[in-house]
Amino acid sequence: MTTKQIKGVLGEKLGMTQVFDESGKVVPVTVLKAGPAVVTRVRTPETDGYSAIQLGYGHINPRKVNKPLGDYLRKHNLTPRRHYVEVRTSDASEYTVGQEITADVFQPGEKVDVTGKTKGKGYAGVMKRHGFGGLGASHGTQRKHRSPGSIGGCATPGRVFKGMRMAGRMGNVRRTVQNLTVHSVDAEKGLLLVKGAVPGPNGGLVLVRTAVKGGK
């Protein structure tokens, strides 16, 4: 069970831009629409064995919600949400079901981890997917310039090892970028500006949490 207080909010990636810092340097930032997310469930060690809060975000047609979830939401007078995620934190008992969490939960200068689903690239070769150098451009190479080369021995070991980097579907996987700095917060518009890039396309779902590394 974690002993660290973790703040978190669900939102969307709006895109990238650039701003100037105090010294006049250009800083690339990603604009995130943070919240409003609603606390839909509070996990406690006494009832669930761990401490966490469940956040809901986005709109969905109530008819698309299954019966168990719909009954729970009606019992607590909650509006159905499209996305749900749990954030483990030691102070979950301080939250209440129905509480709204917005962008002002973070302050400029804080370190955060941002989780999103990367852009899908489809079927890609080893040069694009893994950064292979390919074979020679000349000197006898025939129609194999972008091939991976050897993928294993013949009689020994006589098989292809698991985890061999090969061509395949690229992207559309969950990734987390750690220790991004919050550049600024616009509480009125519900926006977070974080330094650097964030996984996923514009409009993609993101989870912004307190950085787990750093010891602060």
Curated annotation (Swiss-Prot):
Keyword rRNA-binding: yes
Name of the protein described by the UniProt record: Large ribosomal subunit protein uL3
Keywords: Ribonucleoprotein, Ribosomal protein, RNA-binding, rRNA-binding
Protein family according to the UniProt entry: Belongs to the universal ribosomal protein uL3 family.
A single GO cellular-component term on record: cytosolic large ribosomal subunit
Statement: the UniProt record of this protein carries the keyword Ubl conjugation: no
PANTHER family: 50S RIBOSOMAL PROTEIN L3, LARGE RIBOSOMAL SUBUNIT PROTEIN UL3C
Pfam families: Ribosomal_L3
Annotated GO biological process: translation
Job of this protein: One of the primary rRNA binding proteins, it binds directly near the 3'-end of the 23S rRNA, where it nucleates assembly of the 50S subunit.
Source species: Thermobifida fusca (strain YX)
GO molecular function: rRNA binding; structural constituent of ribosome
Assembly, per entry: Part of the 50S ribosomal subunit. Forms a cluster with proteins L14 and L19.
Coiled coil stretches, renumbered: none
UniProt region (Disordered), positions on chain: 135-156
